[in-house]
Curated annotation (Swiss-Prot):
NCBIfam families: PRK00211.1 (NF001238), sulf_tusC_dsrF (TIGR03010). Keywords: Cytoplasm, tRNA processing. It comes from Yersinia enterocolitica serotype O:8 / biotype 1B (strain NCTC 13174 / 8081). Pfam families: DsrE. The gene is tusC. This is Protein TusC.
Length: 121
């Protein structure tokens, strides 16, 4: 049986709720079972990748750095939505905590269509 391609889509900002942390936990767990993973950041999910966050100031757990170790788990396909960046004034940011490929919404949808399962957080 062929392994399914699984996409993880992060649509919510960090620290306001547990969605980002739960998605990252699910991604790490799935990485042990599959090599066909893609990680997408759109809408407020692009905020997950901003460097130099200080969640401890709002008494939140700092899980963001864990995104940076995903390549060690052979997770290597990372995509971020160009429009989402522009809408949040982040189009000039280049020091993301992951090496992401910036895609237009059309190309992001095309890339996402290559996956059998899409999990949204």
């Amino acid at each position: 049986m062929a392994m399914k391609c699984v996409a993880f889509v992060f649509t919510q900002g960090p620290h306001g709720n547990a969605a980002g942390r739960e998605g990252l936990d699910a991604l790490l767990a799935t990485s042990a079972l599959s090599e066909n993973l893609g990680v997408f950041f759109l809408s407020d999910g692009v905020l997950q990748l901003l460097p130099q966050q200080q969640p401890e100031k709002i008494l939140a757990r700092n899980y963001i750095a864990t995104f940076g170790v995903l390549p060690l788990y052979d997770v290597e396909n990372f995509y971020i939505c160009e429009d989402s960046l522009q809408q949040r004034g982040l189009s000039e940011v280049t020091d993301w905590i992951l090496d992401v490929e910036v895609l237009s919404p059309v190309n992001l949808r095309r890339q996402l269509a290559n996956y059998d399962v899409v999990l949204t957080f």
